[in-house]
Amino acid sequence: MTTPRLEAPGVVLRPLEAADAEALFAAHGDATTHTYWSSPAHTSVEQTRTYIAETIAIPGALAWAITESGGEALGRIALFVQREGVGEIGIIMRPEATGRGLASKALNAVVAHAFGPLDLHRIAADIDPDNTSSISLFLRAGFQREGTLRGNWKTHIGIRDSVMMARLRD
C-alpha cells in the first residue's frame, strides 16, 4: 500500500520518511509526550529513525508526517489496515506543535481518506485511559468510546488498560 500525500486546510500530510527522524525525535524523545506509549521515550535520533523504518515496513501501514505546508514534520499519524475494511490510527505530536489544531486536522484528513478511497468501514484507536487529550481528540473527530480492556498493555509505566474507541463509516 502506498502512502499518498493528503492536504486539508491548514495541514499537509506527506509520506513519512527516515529523514523525519530528527524532527520527530522532539516528540519520541520527550518523556512527557511519550508517557502513554508502550515503550519509554527514545534516547537518540537513531532510535527514532529505526522506529520510523519499522513503522513504514509494517504490511498495511500508511504513515504520514504532519506538516503545515509539506515541510518539517511536526507530528506523525499512521493508519494500520491489518484486515479488510478495518484500520487503526495512532498519532503523536511534537510538544511545541500541540494546541494548534494540527492533530485534529490530520486525524480528520486520514479518516476521510480511510472511508473514501480506502473504503474502510471501521477505524479504531487504542488509548491509555489517562491520556485525556488523545481521548478528547478522537471524540471531537466522531469516534465513540466502546469500552476498556483491562491490563491490555505491559509498558514502561506498568500494566495499563486501553480505552477502545472507534468510528464507523457514515
Outline where the language-model segments fall.
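Short loop/turn motifs at secondary-structure junctions and domain boundaries
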Residues: 55-60, 143
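Conserved GNAT-fold acetyl-CoA-binding loop/helix
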Residues: 32-54
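Acyl-donor (CoA/ACP) binding surface of acyl/acetyltransferases
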Residues: 1-31, 63-170
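Short linear sequence elements within intrinsically disordered, low-complexity coil regions
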Residues: 41-42, 56, 120, 148
